[in-house]
């Protein structure tokens, strides 16, 4: 990668950001690396980078058409995309529609419990602290975001959830929950950043009733369920088919 991307700006668990000739544009390379439990578990999922990049590009581009401002510019290779340079807000926004994962552990809710309304949560983006759950008052205390920005994040999160629930339902996939990140561009405008993929969403196959077979996301890696590549491939195929169908109707 170095001969093509001479200046690495940032490397995370799943992606690498490189500078481009335009200071307002970055190139994102999606890796095949897989991590779970705050990088305590590590592995490789063959082809994950290409699949996540393609899925994220399709979803971000579609969300743009629905009025959600994102950092996405274009997909340049199977595992690379150009994005607008943003300053990432140090908060992860999680939206939950069905109880799963940490929500079950922390509340005692049974996995699969349908929530009466979407639950929006905010986590501090800090690996050293274990990405702790934050109350709104703690967010204000830490001065991570302004009250106005917090209201915007909440609004965007719920709008994105409603849009993606409908989109995935047409793919015969249930959107259980998902994590998103936001950043601000040089004008201070908040943009949806990072990615939306099986790495950042819990997705259950509506055509499967078995609780293990229906899992189509990184829980297959977390829980050693196997067939990870096949699950990601299925998500990619259904997402691209749905995008193509929507484009044909436009």
UniProtKB/Swiss-Prot annotation:
GO BP: 'de novo' IMP biosynthetic process; cobalamin biosynthetic process
Matches recorded under InterPro entries: SAICAR_synt/ADE2_N, SAICAR_synt_PurC, SAICAR_synth, SAICAR_synthetase, SAICAR_synthetase_CS
Coiled coil: none
Gene Ontology molecular functions: ATP binding; phosphoribosylaminoimidazolesuccinocarboxamide synthase activity
Broad class of enzyme this protein falls into: ligase
Entries under Gene3D superfamilies matching the protein: ATP-grasp fold, B domain (3.30.470.20), Phosphorylase Kinase, domain 1 (3.30.200.20)
Family: Belongs to the SAICAR synthetase family.
Reaction(s) this enzyme catalyzes, per UniProt: 5-amino-1-(5-phospho-D-ribosyl)imidazole-4-carboxylate + L-aspartate + ATP = (2S)-2-[5-amino-1-(5-phospho-beta-D-ribosyl)imidazole-4-carboxamido]succinate + ADP + phosphate + 2 H(+)
Pfam families recorded: SAICAR_synt
NCBIfam families linked to this entry: purC
Pathway linked to the protein: Purine metabolism; IMP biosynthesis via de novo pathway; 5-amino-1-(5-phospho-D-ribosyl)imidazole-4-carboxamide from 5-amino-1-(5-phospho-D-ribosyl)imidazole-4-carboxylate: step 1/2
Entry protein name: Phosphoribosylaminoimidazole-succinocarboxamide synthase
Enzyme Commission (EC) number: 6.3.2.6
Taxonomic source organism: Picosynechococcus sp. (strain ATCC 27264 / PCC 7002 / PR-6)
Keyword vocabulary terms for this entry: ATP-binding, Ligase, Nucleotide-binding, Purine biosynthesis
């Amino acid at each position: 990668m170095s001969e093509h991307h001479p200046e690495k700006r940032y490397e995370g668990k799943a992606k690498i950001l490189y500078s481009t000739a335009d200071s307002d544009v970055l190139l994102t390379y999606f890796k095949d690396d897989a991590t779970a439990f705050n990088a305590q578990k590590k592995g490789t999922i063959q082809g994950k980078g290409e699949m996540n990049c393609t899925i994220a590009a399709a979803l971000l581009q579609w969300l743009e058409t629905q009025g959600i401002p994102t950092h996405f510019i274009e997909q340049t290779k199977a595992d690379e995309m150009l994005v607008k340079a943003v300053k990432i807000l140090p908060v992860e926004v999680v939206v939950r529609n069905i109880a799963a994962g940490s929500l079950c552990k922390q509340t005692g809710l049974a996995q699969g419990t349908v929530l009466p309304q979407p639950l929006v949560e905010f986590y501090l983006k800090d690996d050293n602290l274990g990405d702790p759950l934050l109350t709104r008052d703690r967010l204000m205390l830490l001065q991570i975001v302004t009250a106005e920005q917090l209201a915007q994040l909440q609004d965007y999160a719920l709008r994105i959830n409603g849009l993606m629930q409908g989109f995935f339902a047409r793919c015969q996939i249930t959107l259980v929950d998902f994590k998103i990140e936001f950043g601000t561009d040089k004008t201070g405008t908040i943009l949806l950043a990072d990615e939306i993929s099986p790495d950042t969403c819990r997705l259950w196959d509506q055509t499967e009733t078995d609780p293990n077979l229906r899992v189509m996301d990184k829980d297959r890696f977390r829980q050693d369920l196997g067939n990870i590549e096949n699950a990601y491939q299925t998500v990619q195929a259904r997402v691209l088919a749905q995008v193509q169908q929507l484009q044909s109707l436009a």
